[in-house]
Amino acid sequence: MNLKQIAKDTAKTLQSYLTYQALRTVLAQLGETNPPLALWLHNFSAGKVQDGEKYIEELFLEKPDLALRIMTVREHIAEEIAEFLPEMVVTGIQQANMEKRRQHLERMTQVSLSHPSPESEQQQFSDPDWDNLAS
């Protein structure tokens, strides 16, 4: 397991996601102040935001002012969440893992209760009074 590579890949994915969030913010702002430009940006962005850096590069070629605006918003979002994001991620993963384990254990327990083993069935129906009558 290459932790440095995992960290790099995670950072790149997070950058792209923050680019997407910045785009949503700018689209909302433009929707109120310049609807035609918001429509243009929406159409331009369709299917292109998966790689945030490539998206910004392509937007620079078309409308540098919008690229700069999205970059500024993205940076602001990153600065605002950087302080508490690592703890939130770790806590979120721990809680999700615990919940999934609990659900799995419940399913396993329900399956074993609904399909008792032959030994447990025999013990269930074993009554000393009935056993004595059989002898």
Swiss-Prot record:
GO-annotated cellular components: carboxysome; cytoplasm
Compositionally biased tracts (Polar residues): 109-126
NCBIfam families: ChaprRbcXCyano
Assembly notes: Homodimer. Interacts with the exposed C-terminal peptide of RbcL ('Glu-459-Asp-468'); binds 1 RbcL peptide per homodimer. Contacts a second RbcL monomer via its peripheral polar surface. A slightly longer RbcL peptide binds to RbcX2 with a higher affinity.
Protein name: RuBisCO chaperone RbcX
Organism: Anabaena sp. (strain CA / ATCC 33047)
Residue ranges, annotated region (Disordered): 103-135
Protein role: An RbcL-specific chaperone. The central cleft of the RbcX homodimer (RbcX2) binds the C-terminus of an RbcL monomer, stabilizing the C-terminus and probably preventing its reassociation with chaperonin GroEL-ES. At the same time the peripheral region of RbcX2 binds a second RbcL monomer, bridging the RbcL homodimers in the correct orientation. The RbcX2(2)-bound RbcL dimers then assemble into the RbcL8 core (RbcL8-(RbcX2)8). RbcS binding triggers the release of RbcX2.
Primary localization class, coarse: other
Domain comment, as recorded: The homodimer has 2 functional domains, a central cleft essential for production of soluble RbcL in which the RbcL peptide binds, and a polar surface which plays a role in correct RbcL subunit arrangement.
InterPro entries: Chaperonin_RbcX_sf, Chaperonin_RcbX, RbcX
Pfam families tied to this protein: RbcX
Induction: Transcribed in light but much less in the dark in both normal air and 1% CO(2); the nitrogen source has no effect on transcription. Constitutively expressed when grown on fructose. Part of the rbcL-rbcX-rbcS operon.
